[in-house]
Amino acid sequence: MAKKTINKELTGAQDLYNFLFEACNIIRGPVSQDNFKDYITPLLYYKRISDVYDEETEEALISSGGDKEYASLPEQHRFVIPDGCHWQEVRERTENLGAAIVGAMRQIEIANPDTLYGVLSMFSSQKWTNKAILNDSKIRDLIEHLSKRKLGNKDYPADLMGDAYEILLKKFADDSKAQAGEFYTPRSVVRLLVHILDPQPGETVYDPACGSGGMLIEAIRYLSLIHISEPTRHSLI
């Protein structure tokens, strides 16, 4: 059963990777492959946050009998999205899309200081606002492509999303002329580290240089498979 689950997850991750890599092809040419991650990564984060927010809103509406005020309370959401900063609202903009994306992500970071401080603002705003590299038409194509799928937890659980993103990072690393080791650790190395650590239920796994969280996700998978008879809720903090 565990093997079938893993195979299903890998198939889903590969499908999502293919979808994300199509986004890379949209900006190929104006953007060198060494810089793909600087555009795809923040946009993926932004779309994911917005879609998870929508899922949480829907759940809150159901549990409250349709109370929109209740559904919009910060307590109902993992991340707060200020007015005008949701993916769909930026999608409806007709010009200066790069600046709109940067502005929305900055405001989301400000609204979530305990969880997103320094996360979204680390991405270069100059790359998004330089129309000589990416004009509004290209950014529009990128937004519309990612809008074809919902990227929330219901469609893509965290571990599957992590797997797809890791495959994408590996592709970036393989194609990059830069030092790939700065942002990608091979899955085989991550898996070996987790097996050596042998985390147990109730313990905390700490990765001070977690990057995209690949080792933390592998630790959760390890616990879920090795201790399958002990139902435990695992959290990434």
Located regions from the model:
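Conserved S-adenosyl-L-methionine
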Residues: Q179-S229, R233-S235
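Non-catalytic, mostly N-terminal accessory regions of nucleic-acid modification and defense proteins
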Residues: M1-P201
